[in-house]
Amino acid sequence: LVLNRARLVGGAEAVPHWADRLAWPSKLHEGGPVSTDSIIGLGLGPDMPVEGISPLLGRLGVVDLHRDPLGLPDVEEVRLFAGYAGWTAGQLETEVAAGGWIVVDASEEDARTADPDGLWRIVLARQGGMVALLADYPDEPDLN
């Protein structure tokens, strides 16, 4: 999923029955260009596995948005994404091997940041070394 592109549409409009469980800012985010008519929810679940949330990292997991949220009382801070990013078989591995991506450890905080627009810089800055320098790279280097 692309984590840092909020849309103008409110998350409560997209999935009203989950409105009181949405993380702030409660916007529908662009998860990527594939299946943009589907909505994926990432949220925090309990420390132990429960039906209705597929664990990803720590307490972070994919939430079954078709379920009644009252049946998942321990699920909170849900962030909504329309669509997802996808690659053909072997494409991503080839791009990573060619140096086209910076691969870093994930943090459950990334998916629920209150500053999705600044997430790219936040993640790069915490890496340290040469990668951290990219966090301060200007959006338009030609204007620097």
Residue ranges of each PLM-predicted region?
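A short aromatic-anchored loop/beta-hairpin motif
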Residues: 1-81, 85-144
